[in-house]
Amino acid sequence: MYNEKIVEILQNPKNVGIIKGANAVGKACSDVCSDILKFYLMIDDGVVIEAKFKTFGGSALIAVASVTTSLLIGRTVDEILAFDTNEIIQVLGNLPNKKGYCLGLVEQALRSAVEDYYKKLEKEQQE
């Protein structure tokens, strides 16, 4: 069902966990199967310096989230907003049928994280 690359990532997913003090946290929930994806980002001077994830979801979502966090390091906030999920497919290969929703969750969770970042930044500037 899963290709070799996905199986390899599932055997040792990267960046699983929570970043204490993350200044950008984004969450997305699937209407299709109730999967939940949460990204924790540490952004310094507008650039992602650390990224982790937690999920209540299946194997495909774990692999997609793991690859995404690796791809985010070194990107600017604007680059996160413009993130193309085809980059994930380039790393993983094609996802099995009915797993494409995982890419949509990534997009939603990243937008949510950027919104959270800007809210926290605005609050910080007002203090």
Summary of predicted features, one role per range:
Residues M1-E127:
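Domain-level signature for proteins that mediate thiol-based redox and metal-cofactor handling
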